């Protein structure tokens, strides 16, 4: 199976109530951008509602999962400092991943078990935003999203939800996963596959809260998100 390459930009974004210079000192990293609440935003008439600090990795064409791994490799040395910074301040942190398809396909979001562990250890959320560039109006119908696992010893385990959010399917899956009582080191690994039936130009919301990433990391499984054409 050939997975298409797309332009991907990953960035660490911290927002909340803090002095950006203190974040720079705590993480020992020079930000790509920073701002204080009340400063002008991207549009002249908009004002920032919170303080912000952004560290962007270089943009590049590649598989989405590989680019996420690259960004996390850069964050790995400061994972402990990052988690302490988030817990010690009124601050939330997110690894934001922008994927530009230029209307040329449907990206596959593949996250390794190691990537999920590092995200969980750092206390970050994950937000994958797909920019399709499609000119067609997206179908407003709510998509059907299925989550299945190859990691259960008794065979595949499935859950289906009707939602715009991939997080809902993963959460419903984990709530009833038969292996949830097992210790992660005793689990056989495997993959959680999320498939969303979408119209052309539409993609599910792929925002994952820190607590759900921690639950995912505890399964010792990887996560794969695919979109496929709507069948009805």
What are these regions (language model features)?
Residues 1-232:
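Acidic (Asp/Glu-rich) sequence patches and key acidic residues
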């Amino acid at each position: 199976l050939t997975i298409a390459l797309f332009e991907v930009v990953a960035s660490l974004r911290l927002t909340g109530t803090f002095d950006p210079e203190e974040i720079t000192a705590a993480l020992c990293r020079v930000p790509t951008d920073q701002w204080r609440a009340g400063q002008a935003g991207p549009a002249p008439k908009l004002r920032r509602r919170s303080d912000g600090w952004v560290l962007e990795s270089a943009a590049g064409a590649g598989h989405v999962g590989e680019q996420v791994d690259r960004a996390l490799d850069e964050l790995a040395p400061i994972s402990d400092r990052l988690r302490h910074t988030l817990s010690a301040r009124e601050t939330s942190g997110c690894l934001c991943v922008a994927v530009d398809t230029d209307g040329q396909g449907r990206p596959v979001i593949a996250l390794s078990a190691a990537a999920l562990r590092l995200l969980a250890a750092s206390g970050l959320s994950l937000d994958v935003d797909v920019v399709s560039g499609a000119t067609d109006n997206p179908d407003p119908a709510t998509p059907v999203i299925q989550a299945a696992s190859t990691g259960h010893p008794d065979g595949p385990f499935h859950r289906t939800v009707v939602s715009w959010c991939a997080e809902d399917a993963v959460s419903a899956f984990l709530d009833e996963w038969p292996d949830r009582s097992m210790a992660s080191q005793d689990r056989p690994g495997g993959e959680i596959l999320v498939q969303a039936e979408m119209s052309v130009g539409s993609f599910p919301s792929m925002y994952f809260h820190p607590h759900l990433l921690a639950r995912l990391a505890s399964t010792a499984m990887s996560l794969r998100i695919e979109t496929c054409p709507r069948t009805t």
